[in-house]
């Protein structure tokens, strides 16, 4: 019976149903996520989940309003509704813990923020890991709160209440609770330093340096709104500390105009002041008490002052004495009325009075105007008078200073001339001094003329100096010989005359001033002002000329010098309108002055357009232009002065005016002294004004001081770092800098999205990897994205452009060209930093390596524990055996103990051997000890029932020996295991760090095409198919070439087999893909030689394959990234990608960086996890030969581009199925079908059972074996054959683990580039992919994709099984092992480490390298050096002609028509010493003008002479050979090359003589490129070694910055030479079947149009047989850019090897080779020099000796076994200057300054002048006198 249910009502329907709508939106767990964007406006962040890579990001339009909120310690609204809380800084990349409000995934909230362990450790304040919580001594450290802000300033509060708060510039406030005796906080001396604070350091000891080095500007303001009575609070208390340290405390009232203040300044001044103005140092009624910078105490009240000095009390600048007479003062002031009035911001003091002069009444009217706001300190009448008096003291000081400068200059010149030589650098210093003298000379002459001082002697000394110096400075590039004594004397005479002139001027001036003050009142108002300006102008001119002389001495303007010059120009611009106004007031013509100003403006303004670049400038013109301006200004102001003085002329006065220098006091007051002389008496009305302006009171500094300040400013500029240019949001196009619009793309140009910027902030944009011309366009926009301004800059190579954002700028956009090959970085700051992608372009994705680390660490710990246990066991066993054998008897019961012990030994023995083999430790001694013990115990244990007699000591020693050897073995294993574990941990850290940079997920394995064909991941199996085509690898791309030109072909990533592909997307590792999502395929595609190709993506919809295609790519498109997409439906069961020819014209296409991803937006290419695991498994590959394109550097470049994802732009995106939709049933090509049947590529079968009916070549991976065993079917007779390790390397993802042994063993030998950590996984090709640091300890908290579980299991199994099977023996290294003598040699052979090539960088020129292809033994063989040693009786019948176009570097010898029967030219001396039996070959180019001559005739002869200076004619020779030609049988009107080989019969001297016997006035013959070489084979012409410096050389050496950046500094270069070669023979220490050698080098090829047969690189010869060639062998293939590394590993069969650097057909190329490393072992090691070699640009030390070179003079000193000599270049030739020859020192020239002594005589130099005669010569005297 059915159970009855209770009654159901309509209202209850559905109550049992659970609502699942949007259940997928719910998340009930906490997640770890990474911040990918900070939304500062709302204090929220956007996140990327670390586990499933899900992004939590709201719409951009919301500006982060609904993104994840950040936690606060407190926050809310206060009682009146105002918000309060806190905002903490957070950075992109920070790891946070995330929860979800109401479990809604759209409402994330950040619960907490976590730093990685590295950062946390650095911030830790303690060095101990834990402690007793009750330990009072550590309470301060344990309970410390420490906050370090991004500005690197901090706030630290320790557990005892001590607190330190720091600010910029290392300023800080410290509160210390320790007892004073124990506290480091003190103001003693300079007080506690920032570095003395314990809190100022990271945990690792590095100092925490604030980001800003400048001291802070501090202001404390104390004020209120209302006081206690409810009235407005008017007090204003300010405490201000300026960045320069000036301290000021002020009190004011907001409704009153007064201020009281206390101030201390950095120069030691202190003052307490009350004034009637709120302005700093303002007011008229002033009371002040202070200490000035000289330490004098002063008191001031109004116009009265007192000053306490060392010698007494002063008032108004005068010393109080007991008998001071003030009557004169009263008399002068008697009758004087004073009127003070204030008008329009200035104070006028008008004094009217009368005085009696010479019995006549003289009226006096004086007006002093002080401009308000310009001069803050008031100057009284007395002060002005005192200043005028003191100006004479200042002038005396100035003269004293001039004397000191002269003394310094004389010392510098004495140092320069001490060796009677002036080098170029010394000439520059001399030029600076001479420029100063030239600039000051007219100024001093003018002053002398003004003051009527005789300047004849000064002029004479100047002229003498000019006459002496000018010829010396005519040639600034070479070293000149000078008479040092004359040079010193001439300069000294000038300086002495100058000081004498200045003293005369000073005396005349002082006398004139004193007289003038007695006879006259004040100078004319405007005349005085104009004269002040004129004097100031002169000083400014002198100072400016000196400054400009310093700046422009080298004809360059650096940025710092531009800032100095700009400062000078700004002063001129400011003074210009004032000067014009003065002139216009008196109607003075300003045309000349204006013209000079405009000329200066026109010259200097362009120099200031780019203040950050060094500019080339005409130094003389710069100096002249400034000098002209100042001269015209002085002339103008003097003219104004003259006009103003006409007022005095009206009274019949003849006034002469005398000017002084304007001096500057410590108070920065500029003074003027004048002399006014009244010529005639009479009633006079004089009027004078002294106007003191702040602009004219400015402290002057020297050029060096200015430069130092500017340099400091540059060093403190803001640095950027974060790239703001986001690649993934860029679009194709080109910005318009005039209106901010985006136009059509040009030359792969792109435009950034709107970049948020700060106003008035420096930014810098930099291009990286740019070749040729490019441009950077930057436009600025306001908050509404309305265009503000823009700028475009063009340049070549890598370059930068600096900006300051406009005041209202909120956004910027940046545009540039060649985005397919060039990177850009746009960052805040003023200095460019290394390129890095933006954070938006780098999304972290981590792969767990923890299991691997644990396994290796466990093995290391186990090995260490085994060693410890073995030691203890051995001690116990030895003690037991000692007890048993002490009576030399072994009873049956003792034998049982011995047997038990022996069984334990037999059990452990194979285990220990296995461990030793696994870790590559020699077990020979251990095995010997074991066998000895075995042999010893066998007879003893044969009978266990009787007592045996034994020798106790032998028994003990045999056991002891075994245990000792076991302990030694296990200790070695422990050491090696620990080393491997440490390296593995280091490796894991590196890989984990690098994996942070990987973005989304790529479902294509081996997708980069780096010598592995791309495969789609289906059931963890890779598939690819090829139809009618073949593949090869070119760079990082797969090149697919069709078998027939009329048949389309393709490359398929995946399989079209529906049985395999139709299992659903889960088989593609796409478990999370849902219906309605998009699959996006993208790849880089390039078409070669015509036709078009495209990318297609196909989905298996039921039983049909349905596809969508990208836009076809043509040859003209170059390398493009294309995209094709398919939408997932409910029928989708499979997917594949195809790169296919789009028509029948395609011969070849290339592709790379294939990517299949989920989503509708294509993202930058990234490696799949399979690629990364492949990198891990195969990081060190035993590669025998690297071809030209397989090199590390190019791998680095391409990998970097892959990670950035911006190498190519996306084109032809098919955003829906309708684009190029082709719905059809898939039909396999015949070759596809055949390939699946016969087991060609693509036929890999993974199964635990063998396939039935296998075809030949089929690969079966036996899954029943652990590890999996791959096998190939050979035939029915042979059956299945296991693959070799080399073949297994191509197995997808390395399931068998066979090359793991190679990985670990070779890792110890691996030496990669300096920028790569030398670890187990230190492959350059792998580690360069990644940039940022990961935190391996966080992996405990992370999970991987569920669909990676199977890979993880395989990986763990691989590690476990692989390590157990490792055979380390062939890879023993010498890193951490205690080697025995018999195994040490083999270890060194494997590890290598010694470069067997000498002079492998070229620092020693071409030493140790033999010649070039068939060394040319004939100097000047194509007359590029002129005739040189060529000559003879008929030399007048020859001339040298310029090169022709076919050989543009080879000159031509031409004969001149004459009736002479024989014309020939040879060398004297004859160039080549030859010996009997030697064979030589002569070759040369020859042509002639048309000639009717039908007989053979000689065109060149070779003769052998008995002596090198024998006359060249035939009758004087020993033997000779002639090269014959006949114009009737051979066309000789075109260039032809002739050769002749001959053998020397008699030893002698060989010469080559071009010859003609044609008697004609018109006929001419021509020769070029003569060559004589050893042997019977004529080779390509090359110049003789002596010709290299003049012809460009066949192979020369070069030192460039690029080579220095590689760590080499020097290299060999062949520049545009048809053929060149250098060889070096290397004798190998030994050879063997298993002994390998490695060769590596770096090469850079620069060429625009290589010829077809161009080749270059290095060849390896064994004996005379060429065995290997490494480099560029096919110029039709792309030639890599920049320096590329090439590697070769080979097994030689001969100990005699030869390394040859070669270039063939290189007339259009420049080739540089450097860093050649030839070492023992199969790992190409990092470059190092040959043993005992030391090379740099100045010193070389090798087996030849020591050479020290002077690069300025091209001279050098050599110390070798043969000589100790010095060489120098004399007249273009290197000559020996001195040498030690036995007991004799030979010198070319000798200079002695005082005497020469050779016992018993001394020779003294005499240069004596007496009253009657002058003695010059040598004096020979006894040496003892």
Swiss-Prot record:
Cellular compartments per GO CC: virus tail, fiber
Transmembrane regions: none
Organism domain of life: Viruses
Key words of the record: Coiled coil, Virion
Keyword Coiled coil: yes
Compartments, record wording: Virion
Coiled-coil ranges per UniProt: 393-466, 681-701, 843-891, 975-998
Role: Structural protein, a component of a tail fiber.
Protein name as catalogued: Tail fiber protein
Taxonomic source organism: Enterococcus phage phiEF24C
């Amino acid at each position: 019976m059915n159970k009855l249910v209770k009654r159901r009502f309509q209202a209850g329907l559905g109550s049992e149903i659970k609502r699942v709508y949007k259940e997928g939106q719910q998340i009930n767990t906490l997640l770890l996520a990474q911040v990918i964007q900070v939304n500062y406006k709302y204090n929220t962040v956007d996140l990327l989940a670390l586990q499933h890579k899900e992004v939590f990001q709201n719409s951009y339009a919301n500006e982060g309003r609904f993104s994840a909120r950040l936690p606060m310690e407190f926050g809310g609204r206060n009682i009146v509704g105002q918000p309060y809380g806190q905002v903490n800084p957070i950075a992109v990349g920070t790891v946070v813990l995330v929860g979800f409000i109401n479990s809604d995934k759209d409402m994330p909230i950040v619960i907490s923020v976590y730093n990685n362990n590295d950062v946390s450790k650095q911030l830790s304040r303690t060095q101990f890991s834990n402690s007793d919580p009750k330990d009072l001594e550590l309470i301060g450290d344990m309970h410390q709160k420490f906050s370090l802000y991004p500005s690197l300033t901090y706030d630290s509060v320790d557990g005892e209440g001590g607190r330190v708060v720091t600010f910029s510039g290392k300023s800080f406030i410290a509160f210390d609770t320790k007892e004073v005796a124990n506290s480091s906080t003190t103001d003693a001396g300079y007080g506690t330093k920032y570095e003395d604070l314990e809190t100022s350091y990271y945990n690792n000891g590095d100092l925490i340096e604030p980001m800003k080095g400048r001291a802070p500007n501090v202001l404390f303001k104390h004020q209120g709104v209302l006081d206690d009575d409810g009235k407005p609070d008017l007090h204003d208390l300010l405490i201000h500390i300026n960045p320069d340290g000036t301290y000021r405390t002020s009190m004011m009232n907001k409704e009153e105009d007064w201020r009281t203040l206390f101030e201390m300044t950095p120069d030691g001044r202190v003052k307490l002041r009350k004034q009637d103005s709120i302005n700093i140092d303002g007011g008229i009624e002033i009371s002040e008490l202070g200490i000035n910078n000289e330490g004098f105490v002063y008191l001031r009240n109004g116009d009265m002052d007192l000053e306490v000095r060392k010698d007494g009390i002063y008032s108004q600048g005068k010393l109080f004495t007991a008998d001071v007479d003030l009557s004169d003062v009263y008399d002068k002031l008697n009758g004087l009325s004073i009127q003070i009035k204030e008008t329009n911001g200035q104070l006028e003091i008008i004094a009217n009075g009368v005085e009696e002069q010479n019995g006549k009444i003289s009226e006096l009217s004086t007006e002093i105007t002080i401009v308000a706001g310009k001069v803050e300190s008031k100057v009284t009448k007395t002060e002005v008078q005192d200043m005028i008096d003191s100006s004479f003291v200042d002038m005396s000081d100035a003269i004293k200073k001039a004397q000191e400068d002269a003394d310094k200059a004389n010392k510098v010149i004495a140092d320069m001339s001490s060796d009677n030589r002036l080098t170029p650098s010394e000439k520059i210093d001399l030029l600076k001094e001479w420029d100063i003298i030239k600039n000051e000379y007219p100024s001093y002459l003018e002053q002398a003329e003004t003051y009527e001082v005789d300047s004849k002697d000064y002029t004479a000394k100047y002229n003498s100096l000019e006459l002496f110096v000018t010829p010396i400075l005519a040639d600034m590039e070479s070293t000149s010989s000078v008479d040092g004594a004359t040079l010193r004397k001439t300069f000294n005479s000038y300086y002495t005359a100058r000081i004498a002139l200045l003293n005369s001027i000073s005396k005349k001036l002082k006398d004139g001033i004193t007289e003038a003050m007695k006879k006259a009142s004040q100078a004319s108002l405007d005349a005085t002002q104009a004269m002040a300006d004129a004097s100031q102008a002169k000083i400014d001119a002198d100072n400016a000329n000196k400054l400009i002389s310093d700046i422009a001495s080298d004809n360059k303007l650096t940025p710092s010098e531009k800032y100095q010059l700009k400062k000078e120009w700004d002063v001129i611009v400011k003074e210009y309108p004032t000067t014009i106004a003065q002139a216009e007031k008196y109607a003075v013509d300003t045309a000349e002055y204006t013209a000079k100003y405009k000329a200066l403006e026109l010259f200097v303004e362009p120099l200031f357009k780019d203040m950050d670049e060094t500019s080339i400038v005409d130094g003389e013109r710069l100096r002249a232009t400034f000098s002209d301006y100042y001269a015209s200004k002085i002339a103008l102001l003097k003219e104004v002065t003259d006009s103003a003085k006409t007022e005095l002329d009206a009274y019949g006065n003849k006034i002469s005016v005398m000017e002084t220098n304007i001096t500057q006091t410590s108070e920065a007051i500029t003074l003027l002294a004048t002399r006014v002389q009244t010529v005639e008496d009479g009633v006079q009305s004089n009027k004078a004004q002294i106007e003191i302006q702040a602009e004219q009171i400015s402290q002057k500094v020297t050029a060096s001081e200015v430069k130092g300040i500017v340099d400091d400013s540059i060093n403190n500029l803001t640095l950027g770092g974060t790239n703001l240019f986001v690649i993934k949001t860029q679009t194709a196009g080109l910005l318009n800098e005039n209106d901010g619009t985006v136009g059509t793309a040009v030359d792969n140009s792109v435009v950034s999205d709107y970049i948020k910027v700060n106003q008035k902030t420096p930014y810098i944009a930099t291009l990286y990897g740019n070749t040729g011309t490019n441009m950077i366009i930057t436009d600025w926009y306001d908050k509404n994205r309305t265009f503000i301004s823009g700028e475009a800059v063009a340049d070549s190579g890598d370059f930068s452009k600096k900006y300051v954002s406009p005041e209202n700028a909120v956004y910027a956009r940046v545009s540039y060209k060649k985005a397919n090959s060039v990177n850009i970085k746009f960052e805040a700051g003023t200095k460019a930093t290394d390129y890095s992608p933006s954070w938006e372009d780098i999304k972290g994705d981590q792969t767990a390596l923890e299991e691997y680390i644990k396994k290796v660490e466990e093995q290391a710990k186990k090995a260490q524990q085994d060693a410890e246990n073995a030691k203890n066991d051995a001690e116990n066993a030895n003690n037991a055996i000692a007890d048993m054998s002490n009576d030399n008897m072994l009873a049956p019961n003792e034998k049982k103990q011995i047997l038990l012990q022996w069984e334990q030994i037999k059990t452990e023995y194979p285990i220990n051997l296995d461990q030793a083999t696994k870790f590559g430790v020699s077990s020979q001694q251990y095995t010997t000890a074991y066998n000895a013990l075995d042999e010893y115990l066998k007879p003893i244990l044969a009978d266990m029932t009787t007592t045996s007699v034994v020798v106790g000591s032998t028994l003990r020693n045999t056991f002891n020996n075994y245990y000792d050897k076991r302990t030694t073995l296990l200790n070695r294993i422990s050491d090696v295991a620990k080393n491997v574990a440490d390296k593995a941990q280091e490796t894991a850290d590196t890989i984990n760090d690098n994996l942070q940079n990987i973005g989304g997920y790529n479902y294509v394995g081996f997708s980069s095409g780096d010598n592995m064909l791309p495969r789609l991941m289906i059931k963890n199996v890779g598939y690819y198919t090829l139809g009618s085509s073949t593949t090869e690898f070119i760079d990082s791309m797969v090149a697919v070439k069709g078998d027939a030109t009329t048949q389309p072909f393709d490359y398929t990533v995946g399989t079209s087999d529906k049985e395999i592909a139709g299992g659903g997307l889960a088989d593609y590792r796409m478990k999370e893909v849902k219906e309605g999502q998009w699959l996006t395929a993208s790849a880089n595609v390039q078409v070669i030689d015509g036709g078009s190709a495209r990318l297609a993506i196909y989905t298996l919809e039921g039983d049909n394959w349905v596809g969508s295609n990208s836009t076809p790519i043509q040859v003209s498109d170059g390398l493009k990234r294309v995209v094709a997409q398919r939408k997932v439906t409910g029928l989708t069961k499979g997917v594949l990608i195809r790169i296919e020819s789009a028509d029948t014209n395609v011969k070849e296409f290339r592709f790379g960086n294939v990517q299949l991803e989920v989503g509708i937006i294509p993202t930058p290419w990234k490696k799949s996890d399979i690629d990364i695991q492949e990198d891990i498994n195969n990081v060190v590959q035993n590669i025998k030969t690297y071809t030209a394109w397989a090199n590390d550097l190019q791998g680095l470049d391409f990998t970097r581009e892959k990670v950035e994802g911006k190498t190519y732009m996306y084109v032809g995106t098919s955003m829906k199925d309708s684009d190029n939709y082709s719905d059809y049933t898939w039909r396999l090509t015949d070759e596809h079908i055949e390939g699946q049947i016969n087991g060609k590529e693509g036929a890999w079968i993974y199964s635990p059972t063998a396939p039935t009916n296998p075809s030949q070549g089929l690969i079966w991976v036996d899954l029943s074996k652990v590890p999996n065993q791959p096998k190939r079917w050979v035939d029915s007779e042979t059956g299945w054959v296991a693959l070799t390790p080399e073949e297994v390397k191509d197995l997808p993802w390395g399931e068998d683990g066979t090359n793991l042994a190679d990985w670990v063993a070779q890792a110890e030998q691996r030496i990669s580039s300096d920028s790569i950590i030398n670890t187990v996984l230190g492959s350059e090709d792998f580690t360069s992919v990644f940039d940022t640091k990961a935190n391996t300890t966080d992996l405990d908290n992370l999970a991987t994709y569920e669909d990676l579980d199977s890979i993880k299991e395989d990986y763990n199994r691989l590690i476990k099984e692989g390590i157990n099977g490792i055979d380390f023996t062939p890879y023993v290294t010498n890193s951490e092992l205690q080697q025995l003598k018999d195994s040490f040699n083999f270890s060194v052979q494997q590890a290598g480490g010694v470069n067997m090539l000498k002079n492998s960088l070229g620092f020693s020129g071409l030493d140790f390298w033999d010649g070039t292809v068939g060394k040319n033994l004939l100097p000047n063989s194509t007359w590029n050096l002129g005739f040189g040693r060529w000559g003879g009786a008929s030399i007048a019948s020859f001339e040298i002609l310029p090169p022709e176009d076919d050989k543009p570097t080879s000159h031509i010898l031409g004969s001149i028509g004459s009736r002479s029967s024989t014309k020939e030219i040879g060398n004297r001396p004859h160039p080549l010493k030859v010996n009997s039996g030697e064979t030589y070959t002569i070759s040369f180019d020859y042509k002639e003008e048309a000639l009717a001559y039908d007989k053979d005739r000689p065109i060149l002869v070779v003769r052998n002479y008995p002596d090198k200076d024998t006359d060249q004619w035939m009758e004087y020779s020993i033997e000779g050979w002639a090269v014959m030609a006949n114009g009737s049988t051979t066309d000789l009107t075109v260039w032809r090359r002739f050769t002749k080989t001959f053998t020397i019969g008699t030893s002698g001297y060989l010469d080559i003589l071009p010859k003609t016997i044609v008697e004609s006035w018109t006929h001419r013959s021509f020769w070029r490129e003569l060559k004589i070489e050893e042997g019977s084979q004529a080779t390509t012409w090359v110049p003789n070694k002596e010709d290299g410096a003049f012809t460009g050389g066949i192979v020369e050496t070069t030192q460039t910055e690029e080579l220095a950046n590689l760590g080499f500094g020097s290299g060999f270069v062949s520049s545009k030479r048809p053929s060149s070669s250098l060889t070096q023979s290397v004798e190998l220490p030994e050879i063997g079947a298993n002994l390998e050698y490695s060769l590596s080098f770096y090469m850079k090829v620069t060429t625009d149009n290589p010829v077809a047969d161009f080749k270059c690189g290095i060849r390896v010869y064994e004996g005379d047989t060429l065995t290997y060639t490494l480099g560029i062998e096919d110029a039709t293939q792309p030639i890599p850019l920049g320096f590329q590394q090439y590697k070769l590993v080979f097994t030689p069969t001969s100990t005699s090897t030869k390394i040859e650097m070669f270039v063939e057909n290189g007339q259009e190329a420049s080739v540089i080779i450097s860093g050649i490393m030839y070492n023992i072992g199969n790992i190409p090691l990092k470059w190092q020099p040959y043993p005992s070699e030391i090379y740099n640009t100045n010193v070389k030390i090798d087996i030849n000796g020591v050479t020290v070179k002077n690069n300025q003079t091209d001279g050098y000193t050599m110390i070798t076994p043969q000589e100790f000599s010095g060489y120098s270049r004399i007249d273009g030739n290197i000559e020996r200057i001195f040498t030690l020859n036995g007991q004799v020192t030979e010198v070319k020239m000798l200079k002695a300054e005082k005497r020469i002594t050779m016992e018993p005589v001394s020779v003294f130099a005499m240069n004596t002048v007496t009253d009657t005669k002058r003695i010059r010569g040598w004096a020979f005297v006894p040496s003892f006198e």
